[in-house]
Amino acid sequence: MASLGKISSSDLETVTTRGVSEIISREEFVQLLKSGKKLRLKMGFDPSRPDIHLGHVVGLRKLNQLQELGHQVILIVGDWTAQIGDPSGQSATRTMLSHEQVLENAQSYLRQFFKVVDKSRAEVIYQSEWFGKFDLAKVIELTGRFTVAQFLQRADFAQRFAEQKPIAITELLYPLLQAYDSVAIESDVEFGGTDQMFNLLVGRELQGMMGQTPQQCFMMPILVGTDGVMKMSKSLDNYVAVDEDPVDMYGKLMSVSDDQIMSYLEYLSLIHISEPTRRTPISEAVF
């Protein structure tokens, strides 16, 4: 493992480019990596279902790479926000879950997460540690920092508003609650999919408002499902579960369309991209 602040050019290239869509801001993130500070790497998850799939693994692998460089992962269990459901990319309001359902799912999630993330270098924190102490005055003070107009700039909200589809007040609160998680743990870097960019940027802005150094936002690419068209999702039945039987997992991965193989290799493996792209003449093939 490299010591803090000591990062090779190859490690830096891998961390900041492989399986990465965008970093806001990349220059600041690189400076942090070289500063010698042990970074607090935040990833939140809403245990709205009991298991995870390879789409989630894209971000978890990146966290593990940074753990190998000496940094600390903070896993936020969204035991409050999971009851609402993340509205990112949704065309309709989600059904709210009970707190008991969320806690049960969380235990299953964590067991699977630690197949990828090093448990000894990770901290698990439940949102209820701070939201359980919130009173109405705190909620009013927090919501007063943003406007409805700002939140309606989100593409999914804007589309639903234009189509006169319902947007629950709880959904408008969701990005703000996720943002406050960053304040509560003093996050240095937050990780999420490209569909989470708005939420991550709200966290960055809220930290600045509250006197903290704004977090860096690390956006991971969306893994296309086994149908070769849509985002990997259990609701679309185009997913490969982390806890899947190996035979079933193999069968599903063999069904991945040819044009998606390179992205699967890049996002989910350590294979050098130059290796699978090199074609071997049939005369040199080993059978």
State where each predicted segment sits.
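A glycine-rich phosphate-binding loop feature that marks nucleotide/adenosyl-phosphate handling sites
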Residues: 220-226, 270
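Single conserved hydrophobic/aromatic residue that forms the stacking wall/gate
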Residues: 271-287
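Predominantly late transmembrane helices and immediately cytosolic-facing juxtamembrane segments
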Residues: 257, 261-270, 274
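Divalent-metal (Mg2+/Mn2+/Ca2+)-assisted nucleotide/phosphate chemistry catalytic cores
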Residues: 20, 96-219
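Conserved phosphate-binding loops in nucleotide/dinucleotide-binding enzymes
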Residues: 93-97, 127, 131, 204-212, ...
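N-terminal catalytic cores of NTP/NDP-binding nucleotidyl/phosphoryl-transfer enzymes
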Residues: 26-87, 189-197, 203
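Positively charged, low-complexity intrinsically disordered leader regions
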Residues: 2-42
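Well-ordered mid-protein domain cores that form the structural environment of catalytic cofactors
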Residues: 64-117
